[in-house]
C-alpha cells in the first residue's frame, strides 16, 4: 500500500495518492485475495514496486533504481508468468515517454533493466519448465484464440470486470490519464494497454476467475489519482461545512464497502473445514491410488489430509474442453481411460456428481462403497461388478 500511495503522489499529488491507496485497500477483490494463500497478492505488490522503481529511475537515472526496477519487474513475472504483457507494456510506456528513442537505446541502464526483467523468468519458464509453459500457453491462450472473434467474450469480460472492480471508475481513470505529465501518462497507458493484452491472451479465465483480474486493482487505483487530485483541489477551496460533508460521504462509502467485504468473509464459516479434511485423510486407505471428484482439484485433501487425489473433471472443465474444440467420446470409454490404474474413486462434490448422471450411475451401480464419512464417499474400483 505504501508504494501505491507514493506512486500516486509522485505522478499527481498527495491527494491523488490517498485516493489511489483508498481504492487499492478497500476494493472487495483486493481484500479477499489478500486473505488467500495464493501468490497473486505478492505478484501485484511486486508489480507496484516495479512501477514505482521505474518512475524513480526515470526521474533520477541512477544505477540503484535501475536495479530495483529491473529486479522487481522480473520477480513479478517469476512469481506469476501471466502478467508478462503488463510488465512489458509498462516498460515500453515509461521508456518511450522518458527520452528520445535514440538516447533510450544507447543508455546502458535501460539494457540493465531489460536484462534483469528477462533473466529469472527466462531461466524458470523456458529452461526449467519449458514444456509446462508451452502446454499452458496452448491450453489457455492460443487454444482459445477463437473466443476473441465472439462479441460475447468482450461483454462477459466487461461485465465481470464491473462486478469486481467497478467499470465506471475504470472509465473515469482512463479518461483522467490525459491530465498526467508525459512520463506518468506513458506509464499508465502502458499499464492499461498491458492489462488489455493480458486479458486478450487469456480469453477464458479473464472472465471466469476473479483473481486473474487482480493486476487491474492498482492500475484502476492509480488511474483515479489525477481526476481525484483535480477534484480535491477544488474541495479545499470550499467552506468548512461542505468539506466536512464531503469527507463524511467519502468515509461512509469506504465504511459501506468495508462492511460488505467483512460480511462476505464472516458469512461463510470455514472453521470446521481443516478438521474435516484431516479426518478424511486419516480415514482414506493408506494403500492404493485414488481418483476423485473433489474440491479445488484435490488441493484441500492434499493440504489438510496429506493425500494425493487425481482429478476427475467437473462440469466447468467439460465446458472448457468444448471451448478448446476437444470432443468427448462415449462416457464408458472415457471412464475406463481416466480410471485405469486407480483403486478408489473419492466424491466430495456431491452437487457435481448429480450434474454428471452417467458417472453417478456407473459408480453406484457397479462399485461398492469402501468408506463413507462426513462429506465424502469412497468407491472401490477394484471390486466393480464389471470386473
Task: Put a short name on every predicted segment.
Residues 75, 86-184, 195-210, 252, ...:
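Transmembrane-lumen/periplasm boundary regions of multi-pass, lipid-linked membrane glycan transferases
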Residues 9-15, 50-66, 76, 180:
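Membrane-interface transmembrane helices that cradle and orient dolichyl/undecaprenyl
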Residues 88, 282-320, 341-353:
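Short periplasmic/luminal acceptor-recognition loop of GT-C membrane glycosyltransferases, typified by
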Residues 168-169, 319-384:
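Periplasmic/luminal catalytic loop of GT-C fold multi-pass membrane glycosyltransferases
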Residues 20-25, 73, 77, 91:
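Short helix- or helix-capping micro-motifs
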Residues 227-232, 241-270, 310-312:
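Transmembrane alpha-helical segments
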Residues 4-26, 45, 63-64, 189-190, ...:
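Transmembrane-helix signature of polytopic, membrane-embedded enzymes
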Residues 35-42:
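Short acidic/glycine- and proline-prone juxtamembrane loop motifs at membrane-interface regions
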Amino acid at each position: 500500500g505504501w508504494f501505491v500511495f507514493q506512486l500516486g503522489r509522485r505522478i499527481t499529488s498527495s491527494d491523488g495518492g490517498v485516493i489511489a491507496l483508498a481504492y487499492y485497500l478497500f476494493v472487495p477483490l483486493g481484500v479477499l485475495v489478500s486473505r488467500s494463500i495464493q501468490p497473486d497478492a505478492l505478484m501485484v505488490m511486486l508489480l507496484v514496486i516495479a512501477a514505482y522503481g521505474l518512475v524513480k529511475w526515470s526521474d533520477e537515472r541512477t544505477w540503484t533504481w535501475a536495479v530495483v526496477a529491473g529486479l522487481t519487474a522480473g520477480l513479478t513475472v517469476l512469481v506469476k508468468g501471466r502478467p508478462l504483457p503488463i510488465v512489458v507494456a509498462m516498460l515500453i510506456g515509461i521508456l518511450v515517454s522518458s527520452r528520445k528513442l535514440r538516447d533510450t537505446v544507447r543508455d546502458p541502464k535501460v539494457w540493465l533493466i531489460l536484462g534483469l526483467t528477462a533473466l529469472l523468468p527466462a531461466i524458470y519458464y523456458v529452461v526449467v519448465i519449458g514444456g509446462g509453459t508451452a502446454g499452458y500457453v496452448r491450453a489457455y491462450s492460443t487454444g482459445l484464440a477463437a473466443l476473441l472473434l465472439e462479441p460475447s467474450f468482450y461483454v462477459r469480460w466487461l461485465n465481470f470486470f464491473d462486478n469486481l472492480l467497478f467499470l465506471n471508475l475504470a472509465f473515469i481513470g482512463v479518461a483522467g490519464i490525459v491530465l498526467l505529465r508525459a512520463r506518468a501518462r506513458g506509464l499508465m497507458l502502458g499499464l492499461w494497454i498491458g492489462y488489455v493484452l493480458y486479458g486478450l491472451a487469456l480469453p477464458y479465465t479473464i472472465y471466469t476467475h476473479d483473481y486473474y483480474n487482480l493486476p487491474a486493482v492498482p492500475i484502476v487505483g492509480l488511474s483515479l489519482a489525477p481526476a481525484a487530485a483535480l477534484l480535491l483541489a477544488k474541495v479545499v477551496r470550499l467552506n468548512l461545512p461542505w468539506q466536512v460533508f464531503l469527507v463524511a460521504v467519502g468515509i461512509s462509502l469506504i465504511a459501506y464497502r468495508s462492511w460488505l467485504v467483512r460480511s462476505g468473509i464472516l458469512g461463510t464459516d470455514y472453521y470446521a473445514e481443516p478438521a474435516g479434511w484431516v479426518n478424511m485423510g486419516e480415514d482414506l486407505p493408506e494403500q492404493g491410488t485414488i481418483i476423485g471428484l473433489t474440491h479445488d482439484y484435490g488441493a484441500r485433501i492434499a493440504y489438510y489430509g496429506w493425500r494425493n487425489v487425481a482429478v476427475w473433471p467437473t462440469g466447468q472443465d467439460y465446458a472448457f474442453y468444448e471451448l478448446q474444440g476437444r470432443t468427448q467420446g462415449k462416457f464408458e470409454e472415457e471412464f475406463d481411460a481416466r480410471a485405469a490404474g486407480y483403486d478408489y474413486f473419492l466424491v466430495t462434490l456431491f452437487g457435481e456428481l448429480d450434474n454428471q448422471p452417467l458417472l453417478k450411475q456407473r459408480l453406484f451401480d457397479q462399485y461398492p462403497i469402501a468408506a463413507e464419512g462426513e462429506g465424502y464417499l469412497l468407491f472401490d474400483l477394484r471390486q466393480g461388478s464389471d470386473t
